[in-house]
Regions:
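Flexible, glycine-/charge-rich segments associated with ATP-binding catalytic modules
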Residues: 146-180
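Glycine-rich acidic phosphate-binding loop
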Residues: 134-142, 169-171
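Conserved ATP-binding N-box helix of the HATPase_c
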Residues: 12-19, 23, 95-123
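Short, non-transmembrane amphipathic alpha-helical segments
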Residues: 105-111, 142-153
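Conserved DHp (HisKA) dimerization/phosphotransfer helix of two-component histidine kinases, i.e.
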Residues: 5-88
Length: 180
């Protein structure tokens, strides 16, 4: 399990090492604060690893567990200085793949926008489908995420807000009772 988690979080671990090295070198208080704000990456590593542990132990991940991951990450984004709100509707169980895909998409958006992120709204609805919608105010274009998430939909409005959506089919074996 440890090797699997290390492999899957290798990019974020490398980013964290680079940030810590830069933090040790900087003498600028504003830059140090900015670097410290990037504990978002550390939270992602911790929470994603936890999703894998829970998923392996229980065979599925509850929507509540995913909610806890996103809420903690959202709190860190607020500390970082951006507005952030997470809304998750629905209950039941998700596969490990579904839960990590949701969390990975969230993290990919945050990592892409980290330097310019002003606001992020995350909305997830779990029913027959797992529907993910993110509204992002930041300077970096997110359309490039489609290479990593092929079924991703992206658009940008005239005010520069970006909308990222993805729809995942729920696996029958982990649907909550009464949702079949």
């Amino acid at each position: 399990l440890y090797d699997m988690m290390e492999t899957q979080a290798a990019r974020q671990i490398a980013m964290l090492r680079d940030l810590l090295a830069e933090l040790q070198k900087t003498e600028e208080p504003d830059r140090a604060r900015h670097l410290l704000g990037q504990v978002i990456i550390g939270t992602y590593i911790k929470r994603r690893s936890n999703l894998i542990f829970v998923g392996v132990q229980r065979g599925a991940i509850s929507v509540q567990e995913l909610r806890l991951c996103l809420n903690e990450s959202s709190e860190n984004i607020i500390v970082y200085g951006a507005d952030c709100k997470t809304t998750i509707k629905g209950e039941g169980q998700l596969t490990v793949e579904q839960a990590t895909q949701v969390y990975d998409l969230f993290e990919a958006v945050v990592e892409t926008e980290l330097e310019s992120l002003r606001a992020l709204l995350i909305s997830i609805e779990v029913g027959k489908w797992v529907e993910i919608a993110l509204c992002v105010s930041g300077a970096e274009p997110l359309c490039g995420l489609r290479t990593r998430f092929p079924d991703l939909e992206w658009e940008q409005d005239e005010d520069g807000l970006q909308y990222v959506t993805q729809k995942l089919e729920r696996t029958r074996s982990v649907k909550a009772h009464g949702q079949d």
